[in-house]
């Protein structure tokens, strides 16, 4: 059974340039709103294609980022210098190309700890700095997963107390991870999915039009926040009714 989502804002992009501009505009708006109310702008990052897209957005937009703090919506349980590390991917891109970003602005997971302790420690770090995230930037896989919430592991969607949980036997390598849970995600002021590629067109429709709950991304519904979907022409080709 589908449940009605709150207001969804869809931003279609005909080109990568338009998508990067939309991402930059989103960052600017959310940053201005956050810094008008408190002394920092809290952002949750996701990996994959978002790393490059965000790098391009920040390079093309003249944004003041000194008061931005970056967390990770999920992280692979690997060494921070491993090629699979989401933190490592951002560090490699941003610290070499974006002089406005400092390493101290990243709040990273301590993957040297046992997996359960790593998740609990990261939850404590989140709680100590953030009540509600100002912006979470999420991707979505062709299987409808987001963060490290996978359709093959539906029990993760039922978590009600913990904000960060360990993941074992992930269907997508590497097998061990930590991830934000729905209570934390759905409390955010702004949640934005950034989805590209025609291979994801069908699941975009299933999640955002049909609200099919067999896909974890369909459970994302910020109850007191704004949900935004930024799509390129390929990913958005089956959702004309939402545009």
From Swiss-Prot:
Family: Belongs to the glucosamine/galactosamine-6-phosphate isomerase family. 6-phosphogluconolactonase subfamily.
Recorded metabolic or biological pathway in which this protein acts: Carbohydrate degradation; pentose phosphate pathway; D-ribulose 5-phosphate from D-glucose 6-phosphate (oxidative stage): step 2/3
Keywords from the named record: Hydrolase
Keyword tRNA-binding among record annotations: no
SUPFAM superfamilies, per database record: NagB/RpiA/CoA transferase-like
GO cellular component, one term: cytosol
Catalytic activity from the UniProt record: 6-phospho-D-glucono-1,5-lactone + H2O = 6-phospho-D-gluconate + H(+)
Superkingdom classification of source: Eukaryota
This enzyme's EC code(s): 3.1.1.31
An example Gene Ontology molecular-function term: 6-phosphogluconolactonase activity
Originating species: Drosophila melanogaster (Fruit fly)
Any single biological process term in GO: pentose-phosphate shunt, oxidative branch
InterPro entries found in the cross-reference section: 6-phosphogluconolactonase_DevB, Glc/Gal-6P_isomerase, NagB/RpiA_transferase-like, PGLS
Protein name: Probable 6-phosphogluconolactonase
Described function: Hydrolysis of 6-phosphogluconolactone to 6-phosphogluconate.
């Amino acid at each position: 059974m589908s449940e009605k989502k709150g207001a969804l804002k869809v931003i279609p992009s005909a080109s990568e340039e338009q998508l990067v501009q939309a991402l930059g505009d989103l960052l600017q708006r959310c940053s201005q709103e956050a810094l008008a109310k408190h002394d920092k702008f809290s952002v949750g990052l996701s990996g994959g294609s978002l790393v490059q897209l965000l790098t391009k957005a920040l390079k093309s937009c003249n944004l003041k980022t000194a008061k931005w703090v970056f967390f990770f919506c999920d992280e692979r349980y690997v060494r921070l210098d491993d090629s699979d590390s989401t933190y490592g991917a951002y560090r490699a891109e941003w610290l070499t190309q974006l002089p406005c970003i400092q390493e101290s602005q990243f709040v990273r997971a301590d993957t040297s700890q046992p997996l359960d302790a790593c998740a609990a420690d990261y939850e404590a770090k989140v709680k100590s700095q953030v009540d509600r995230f100002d912006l979470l930037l999420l991707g979505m896989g062709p299987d409808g997963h987001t963060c490290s919430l996978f359709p093959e592991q539906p029990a993760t969607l039922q978590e009600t107390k913990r904000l960060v949980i360990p993941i074992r036997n992930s269907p997508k390598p590497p097998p061990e991870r930590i991830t934000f849970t729905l209570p934390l995600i759905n409390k955010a002021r702004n949640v934005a999915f950034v989805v590209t590629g025609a291979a994801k067109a069908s699941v975009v429709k299933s999640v955002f039009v049909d609200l099919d709950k067999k896909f974890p991304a369909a459970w994302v519904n910020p109850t007191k926040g704004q949900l935004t979907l930024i799509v390129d022409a390929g990913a958005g080709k089956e959702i004309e009714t939402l545009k």
